[in-house]
């Protein structure tokens, strides 16, 4: 699972979940991508589950890029504990996916395989997504 090596502070405030994504809105590495259309927290377990679903369908062909990283901790207090007595323990790590953000990219497979692999991955995620190509979004081209 993905989590940061070290953090400056163990516990943080909850991140904002309003507005559109400021960066990471273009397909830069691969040919096809999975773009978020709604806002939600995505946990490191959900990211890993989506990655496994994609790579199993592609039979380890092609290449997958994970374009989000869960660098924000979320905390939770134990069950049946009274209010107060400080913030709870870190329960896991989340990434905030806002509309427009590219979550995964794929290259090295044809469009039908990429579309189905990203569809399987989208079922593991709590956000609504859409399939995008590099040409549609105007990403960089690697022509030399």
Curated annotation (Swiss-Prot):
Classification via InterPro entries: Ribosomal_uL16 (IPR047873), Ribosomal_uL16_bact-type (IPR000114), Ribosomal_uL16_CS (IPR020798), Ribosomal_uL16_dom (IPR016180), Ribosomal_uL16_sf (IPR036920)
GO cellular component term of the entry, any: cytosolic large ribosomal subunit
Keywords: Ribonucleoprotein, Ribosomal protein, RNA-binding, rRNA-binding, tRNA-binding
Pfam family, one: Ribosomal_L16
CDD domains: Ribosomal_L16_L10e
GO MF annotation list: rRNA binding; structural constituent of ribosome; tRNA binding
Ranges of Basic residues composition bias in the record: 1-19
Region (Disordered): 1-23
Alphabetical GO biological process terms: translation
Superkingdom of the organism of origin: Bacteria
Family recorded in the similarity comment: Belongs to the universal ribosomal protein uL16 family.
Function: Binds 23S rRNA and is also seen to make contacts with the A and possibly P site tRNAs.
Subunit structure: Part of the 50S ribosomal subunit.
Protein name: Large ribosomal subunit protein uL16
Organism ancestry: Bacteria, Bacillati, Bacillota, Bacilli, Bacillales
Gene giving rise to this polypeptide: rplP
């Amino acid at each position: 699972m993905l989590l940061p090596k070290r953090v400056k502070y163990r516990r943080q405030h909850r991140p904002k979940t309003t507005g559109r994504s400021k960066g990471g809105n273009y397909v830069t590495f691969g040919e096809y991508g999975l773009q978020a259309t709604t806002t939600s927290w995505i946990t490191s377990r959900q990211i890993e589950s989506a990655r496994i679903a994609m790579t199993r369908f592609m039979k380890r062909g092609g290449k997958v890029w994970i374009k989000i990283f869960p660098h924000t901790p979320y905390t939770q207090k134990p069950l049946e504990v009274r209010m107060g007595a400080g913030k709870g323990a870190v329960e896991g790590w989340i990434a905030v996916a806002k509309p427009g953000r590219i979550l995964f990219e794929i290259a090295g497979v044809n469009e039908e395989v990429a579309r189905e692999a990203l569809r399987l991955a989208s079922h593991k995620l709590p956000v609504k997504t859409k399939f995008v190509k590099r040409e549609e979004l105007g990403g960089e081209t690697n022509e030399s």
